[in-house]
């Protein structure tokens, strides 16, 4: 089922979200506006960490990847309301470090796409947690 067409019964709650906004300038979503929207939408849940970076994909689409970690769960629909033009992944796989490496296109796994990232567009707030947050528990990383 398409993420944008979920039913209310599928309105799951998560602590980690990965968003992609295609053509953010079309929706006037500068980094400043995105930061403002994150602070506004997630303040009550306690923002642990977030980062973003711009990229031009292989098909030529300019887009912004955003990764957000919060202390309390938030409903998918609330995130969709805050970012109506974003594709939202609720099943974020990997540790925070792995997701940040993906966004930055760093490491062996992401090296082939390094040139798609736009220089000087990476932004982050908070410290990358040294624990893994799943939807059921937090585990210390070794």
Predicted regions and their residues:
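Catalytic "initiation/cleavage/transfer" segments centered on a nucleophilic residue
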Residues: 1-43, 71-142
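Short, glycine- and small/hydrophobic-rich beta-strand elements in well-ordered beta-sheets
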Residues: 44-59
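Beta->alpha loop/short-helix hinge microenvironment recognizer with preference
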Residues: 56-61, 88, 92
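Short catalytic/ligand-binding loop motif for oxyanion handling, primarily in non-cytosolic enzymes
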Residues: 60-62, 76-77
């Amino acid at each position: 089922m398409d993420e944008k067409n979920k039913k209310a019964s599928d309105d799951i709650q998560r602590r980690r979200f990965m968003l992609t906004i295609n053509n953010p300038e079309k929706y006037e979503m500068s980094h400043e506006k995105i930061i403002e929207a994150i602070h506004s939408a997630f303040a009550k849940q306690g923002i642990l960490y977030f980062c973003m970076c711009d990229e031009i994909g292989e098909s030529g689409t300019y887009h912004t990847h955003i990764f957000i970690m919060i202390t309390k769960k938030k409903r998918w629909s609330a995130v969709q309301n805050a970012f109506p033009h974003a594709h939202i992944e609720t099943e974020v796989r990997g540790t925070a470090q792995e997701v940040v490496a993906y966004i930055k296109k760093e490491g062996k796994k992401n090296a082939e796409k390094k040139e798609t990232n736009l220089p000087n567009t990476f932004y982050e707030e908070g410290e990358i947690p040294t624990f893994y947050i799943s939807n059921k528990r937090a585990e210390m990383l070794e």
